[in-house]
């Protein structure tokens, strides 16, 4: 069994929904009066989709104990999907009936994704307002800058390590 990471699923699901056409932000946990969600996707139409990413049965079971059941009290979410590796298909009884299921399979070329079950559309859904979309896009750009800062920090550490290694080689 080829283990699939959360990060691999995030990037594949973002490509699947079309990150060139949608606002897609990972790890929404504040600022929108919304429960935590792994990926929030806002389509050109203004409707939102939540994608929960689960890579283990224990993570999936723990999700059922959170109490919010992935229901947006403000009806901004049109659909809910759970993205799971193919080796977790035997755990779908923990996924709410109204949720769609995306299954990811790792192969030599990357990850394939298929829809095991389509999500039920929230009939009371409403579009995100321009202000809400701007706030979500702002959260997404904050993620980018934090990621760049982390990458730069790693680059500095690597450069320092290379200099130290060269110094060690000169000593011997």
Task: Give each language-model segment a name.
Residues 41-43, 55, 103-105:
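Residue-level signal for short segments within beta-strands and strand-turn junctions
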Residues 37-50:
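Active-site beta-strand-loop-beta-strand hairpin of nuclease catalytic cores
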Residues 48-52, 57-70, 90-93:
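Active-site-adjacent loop/helix micro-motif of nuclease/hydrolase catalytic cores
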Residues 1-7, 11-19, 95-172:
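Non-catalytic C-terminal interaction segments of nucleic acid-processing enzymes
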């Amino acid at each position: 069994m080829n283990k699939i990471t959360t990060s691999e699923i995030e990037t594949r699901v973002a490509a699947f929904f079309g990150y060139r056409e949608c606002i897609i932000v990972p790890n929404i946990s504040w600022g929108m009066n919304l429960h935590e969600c792994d990926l929030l996707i806002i389509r050109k139409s203004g409707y939102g989709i939540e994608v929960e990413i689960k890579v283990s049965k224990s993570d999936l079971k723990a999700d059922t104990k959170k109490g919010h059941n992935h229901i947006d009290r403000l009806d901004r979410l049109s659909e809910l999907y759970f993205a799971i590796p193919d080796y977790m298909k035997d755990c779908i009884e923990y996924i709410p009936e109204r949720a769609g299921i995306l299954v990811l399979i790792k192969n030599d070329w990357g990850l394939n994704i298929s829809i095991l079950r389509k999500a039920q559309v929230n009939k009371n859904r409403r579009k995100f307002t321009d202000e809400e979309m701007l706030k979500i896009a702002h959260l997404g750009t904050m993620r980018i800058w934090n990621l760049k800062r982390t990458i730069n920090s790693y680059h500095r550490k690597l450069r320092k390590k290379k200099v130290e290694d060269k110094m060690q080689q000169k000593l011997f």
